[in-house]
């Protein structure tokens, strides 16, 4: 005997009421999944269905979708050439590639518009999704049993705690605090942030200390502490070229820490586009958590 519509609704409401988690979606990042799957058709409906499916899988009482809208004003203030390498890459596109990109971003815009009818969805000009996600975790993460970050971006692992994990829809893997060494060659988030400050991030055009990769960086952090501890101890002993480079990089280390430390600088990153913007975003997120 098939279920009545009333029974189906009752079970759906009971399932929703049992959810205790928060899910934060890297919305632009998720959109590129459809582009990389060579989708040349509108994908708004599939986009929202994917988020709904993930929300059910991760028992999300609250789901928040975030999008990027231009480069981070905050990071550009500290590093004017931030992500400048991407501008060069885009300038070299063929006319066909430009047309496909324009079409994709139109479809992505449609996906976000449809998403707004189902989930709280935010894009702020000059603020990156990373910073909004970090602030949401800081502001309301403690109100939930667990927080799930949906992104392929490993930078989001700077937000991991015992109660915060990440799922990547490309690797189909979950990333937890206990797995930091396996995925990032460090023992914890503090070391991960310090390693990123030392190495930089060429993908974002952030220069690091020349001659120091993941292995050397990890060994330095293990011996001398986090990046602020290292700065306090400069110059470090040693005649190796990479040590000399490190000793000459105090300003670079400070700058890079500001650029990569999402938990510490997320508030500043949002406020960089206006205190009123931060205040409204704070109010909106707190209201969502109360629902």
Swiss-Prot record:
EC class (word): hydrolase
BP terms from Gene Ontology: DNA replication, Okazaki fragment processing; late viral transcription; viral DNA genome replication
Annotated GO MF terms: 5'-3' DNA exonuclease activity; 5'-3' exonuclease activity; 5'-flap endonuclease activity; DNA binding; DNA exonuclease activity; double-stranded DNA 5'-3' DNA exonuclease activity; double-stranded DNA endonuclease activity; metal ion binding
Binding site for Mg(2+) 1: 130
Keywords: DNA replication, DNA-binding, Early protein, Endonuclease, Exonuclease, Hydrolase, Magnesium, Metal-binding, Nuclease, Potassium, Viral DNA replication
Binding residues annotated for DNA, in chain numbering: 83
Binding site for K(+): 209, 212
Region Helical arch, annotated ranges: 82-116
SMART domains: 53EXOc, HhH2
Induction statement: Expressed in the early phase of the viral replicative cycle.
Binding sites annotated in the UniProt record for Mg(2+) 2: 130, 153, 155
Entry's pH dependence statement: Optimum pH is 9.3 for the exonuclease activity, 5.5 for endonuclease activity. High pH favors the exonuclease activity whereas low pH favors the endonuclease activity.
Effect of residue 33 to A: 10 fold increase in the dissociation constant for pseudo-Y binding. 3 fold increase in the dissociation constant for 5'overhangs binding
Gene Ontology CC terms, in alphabetical order: viral replication complex
HAMAP family xref list: FEN_T5
Domain notes: Three alpha-helices form a helical arch which forms a hole in the protein and through which the 5' flap of the scissile ssDNA is threaded.
PANTHER family tied to this protein: 5'-3' EXONUCLEASE FAMILY PROTEIN, FLAP ENDONUCLEASE XNI
Name recorded for this polypeptide: Flap endonuclease
Species whose genome carries this gene: Escherichia phage T5
Lineage, broadest ranks: Viruses, Duplodnaviria, Heunggongvirae, Uroviricota, Caudoviricetes
